[in-house]
Swiss-Prot record:
Keywords assigned by UniProt, alphabetized: Behavior, Glycoprotein, Secreted, Signal
Highest rank taxon of the organism: Eukaryota
Cell compartments where the protein resides: Secreted, Extracellular space
Record: glycosylation sites: N83, N90, N131
Organism listed in the record: Drosophila mauritiana
Name used for this protein in its record: Accessory gland-specific peptide 26Aa
Signal peptide positions on this chain: 1-18
GO terms, biological process: mating
Tissue expression as described in the entry: Main cells of the accessory glands of males.
Compositional bias segments (type: Polar residues): 82-95, 240-250
Described function: This protein is transferred from male to female's hemolymph during mating, affecting egglaying and behavior after mating.
GO cellular component, as recorded: extracellular region
Amino acid sequence: MNQILLCSQILLLFFTVANCDGEHQLDSSVDLKSAVLKNVAPKNVATQAEIVKDDVALKSGKKGDYVMDIEVSDMPLDDYPINNSKSRKNSSTLPSPILTDKLNQGSNQIALKALKHRLVMEQNNNLFLRNHSVSLMNEIEARKTDIIQARQLNIDLELELESLKRKLSEMNVQNARKSTKSCKKRPSKDIAPPVNQLQEVIVKNTYRNKYLTLLTQLAQKINYEIANVNNPATDVPTGKSPSEGNPSTT
């Protein structure tokens, strides 16, 4: 953009210089034309006297009459054929200022056309660069939107991944808890019972055996007492009280 502004300023400077040169050349051409038009022959007194002497109208005229003078000398020198030939010779030998002005004007027009063409090219280049910059800005905005959408999608995927990790850890914890629970199924014959169940069976058997022994001893004592009551003569003192009884025989 800075180069484009610099080129536009340079072109504006060229236009102002060309306009100033054109105005200066026009002023010089006007001065030259006015100088050429003022190129008249000076008055000659001797030739004027000869004209009066030879003229019949002037001879027949009375004194005191106002005679109109033919201002031959006031005519421009270009009207005479001799002067025209001289002017042609001079124009062929010396460069005419009008021709130089025309040449300068032609060169100025060529330079002006070249500058206009250069200006049009710069404007087209500027327009192309502007359109290219606009397209680049649009592409940048589109890329920004794509990046924002990709980031949002990445965030969503990260959240889903975190939720899946959490669910997986919960499932692992539940599986670990299930594996630590005791089995409620009945033990098979091949598998030995646990220690607690064995101790319980042993205790039950010992108490049952003790209960059975006590019952048998009680039954034997009752039978012995009944027999002693029925046969008192056969009672022989042994130094023991009848309540002690005989030792049990199993």
